[in-house]
């Protein structure tokens, strides 16, 4: 029969992290619960939605937790309801006691709340991942890679493989990450400091965004373990499991052009603001596009909406080389790409009005490239 006391605020923080893996609308009702597992070492909170699972460990050695364990055990509690109850408690200390099989009393200050739980044996087991040699990355670096690529993944389930980000490690240290929804593509390459075993996996972009929310910047490094159909990201206290997407990711290398006819360097903030102004009107047009015109070294953006009005704006540039060109595209794709850049300047290179164009940071030596497909207009 479980009995422990803990700092309420730290417990609530840990519950909210674990809750990110829990869906109240799950087809499997037991997955709307949080599993609380109490051992001599500490308290583990477990949540899962079948796609991702989070185990969050609060150690007895963590002084901030003020954790006192009297007796051990495990129980399931309805996650959202339990978290609301805990957050409403008046005092900074919370006493958690199982009074009879799967029934608990929470005591805090002068408040005492009794809750019914469920037998923890009903909870599905998380597949073990063998602790082979992990890939170790800085958390900030991995989150940066996710920020630079995951947005370009598809949100359509018609081609499930494209809803993921393709991570490939070759020659033991060359990491390439790619995401595409077939209208745009984002690719980041870098060389790791330490050798690791090669891998080729497709991780759901939704899982990666959750990873970024769960692993805060104060967690310095993350260990990554691979199994047949899932991957584990682990820090000292958090284990984050996600299923991998099955199937072969398309060969994206052949999509990336190398020769261009027109190249322009822009200030990222200026270009983004211009595109956001253009998008206000383009969203009211039939095809939602903005037309970019490059003529005699001058670059201008145009949108014409019969219902709303029009935009004509000359855009400041740092450098323009090559041929004149008129090209139309979805401004949201360009805005998203510019948001993912960590540079002040961007170089955009064009081949023709109907071929994809590329964006690369102009003032850093990062190997980061994005591709956007234009829209054919009359």
UniProtKB/Swiss-Prot annotation:
Q: Which UniProt keywords apply?
A: Cytoplasm, DNA replication, DNA-binding, DNA-directed DNA polymerase, Nucleotidyltransferase, Transferase
Cell cycle recorded as keyword: no
Question: CDD domains of this UniProt entry?
Answer: beta_clamp
Which biological process, per GO, is one annotated for this protein? Answer: DNA strand elongation involved in DNA replication
Q: Which InterPro entries match?
A: DNA_clamp_sf, DNA_polIII_beta, DNA_polIII_beta_C, DNA_polIII_beta_cen, DNA_polIII_beta_N
Name the predominant localization: cytoplasm
Q: Which GO terms describe its cellular component?
A: cytoplasm; DNA polymerase III complex
Q: Name one GO molecular function term.
A: DNA binding
* Source domain of life: Bacteria
Its subcellular locations are: Cytoplasm
Protein family (similarity comment): Belongs to the beta sliding clamp family.
Query: Function of this protein?
Result: Confers DNA tethering and processivity to DNA polymerases and other proteins. Acts as a clamp, forming a ring around DNA (a reaction catalyzed by the clamp-loading complex) which diffuses in an ATP-independent manner freely and bidirectionally along dsDNA. Initially characterized for its ability to contact the catalytic subunit of DNA polymerase III (Pol III), a complex, multichain enzyme responsible for most of the replicative synthesis in bacteria; Pol III exhibits 3'-5' exonuclease proofreading activity.
The protein's assembly and partners: Forms a ring-shaped head-to-tail homodimer around DNA which binds and tethers DNA polymerases and other proteins to the DNA. The DNA replisome complex has a single clamp-loading complex (3 tau and 1 each of delta, delta', psi and chi subunits) which binds 3 Pol III cores (1 core on the leading strand and 2 on the lagging strand) each with a beta sliding clamp dimer. Additional proteins in the replisome are other copies of gamma, psi and chi, Ssb, DNA helicase and RNA primase.
Know the name of this protein?
Answer: Beta sliding clamp
Organism for this UniProt entry: Streptococcus pneumoniae (strain ATCC BAA-255 / R6)
The protein's gene is named dnaN
């Amino acid at each position: 029969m479980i009995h422990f006391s803990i700092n309420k605020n730290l417990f609530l923080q840990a519950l909210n992290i674990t809750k990110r893996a829990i869906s109240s609308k799950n087809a499997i009702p037991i997955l709307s619960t949080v599993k609380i597992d109490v051992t001599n070492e500490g308290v583990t909170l477990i949540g899962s939605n079948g796609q991702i699972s989070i185990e969050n460990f609060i150690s007895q050695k963590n002084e901030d937790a003020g954790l006192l364990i009297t007796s051990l055990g495990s129980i399931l509690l309805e996650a959202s309801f339990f978290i609301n109850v805990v957050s409403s408690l008046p005092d900074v200390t919370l006493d958690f006691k199982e009074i009879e099989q799967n029934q608990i009393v929470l005591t805090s200050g002068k408040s005492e709340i009794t809750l019914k739980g469920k037998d923890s044996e009903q909870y599905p087991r998380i597949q073990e991942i063998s602790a082979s040699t992990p890939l170790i990355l800085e958390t900030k670096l991995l989150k940066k890679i996710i920020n630079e690529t995951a947005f370009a993944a598809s949100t359509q389930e018609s081609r499930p493989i494209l809803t993921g980000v393709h991570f490939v490690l070759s020659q033991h240290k060359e990491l390439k990450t790619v995401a595409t929804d077939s209208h745009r593509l984002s690719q980041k390459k870098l060389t790791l400091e330490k050798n690791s075993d090669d891998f080729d996996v497709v991780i759901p972009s939704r899982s990666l965004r959750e990873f970024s929310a769960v692993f805060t910047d104060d967690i310095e490094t993350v260990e990554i373990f691979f199994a047949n159909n899932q991957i584990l990201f682990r820090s000292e206290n958090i284990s984050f499991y996600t299923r991998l997407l099955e199937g072969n990711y398309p060969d994206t290398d052949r999509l990336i052009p190398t020769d261009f006819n027109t190249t322009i360097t822009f200030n990222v903030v200026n270009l983004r603001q211009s595109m956001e102004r253009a998008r206000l009107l383009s969203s009211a047009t039939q095809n939602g596009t903005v037309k970019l015109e490059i003529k005699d070294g001058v670059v201008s953006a145009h949108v014409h909406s019969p219902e709303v009005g029009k935009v004509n704006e000359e855009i400041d540039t740092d450098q323009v080389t090559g041929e004149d060109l008129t090209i139309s595209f979805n401004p949201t794709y360009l805005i998203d790409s510019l948001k993912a850049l960590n540079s002040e300047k961007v170089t955009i290179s064009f081949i023709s009005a109907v071929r994809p164009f590329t964006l690369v940071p102009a003032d850093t030596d990062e190997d980061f490239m994005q591709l956007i497909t234009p829209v054919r207009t009359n």
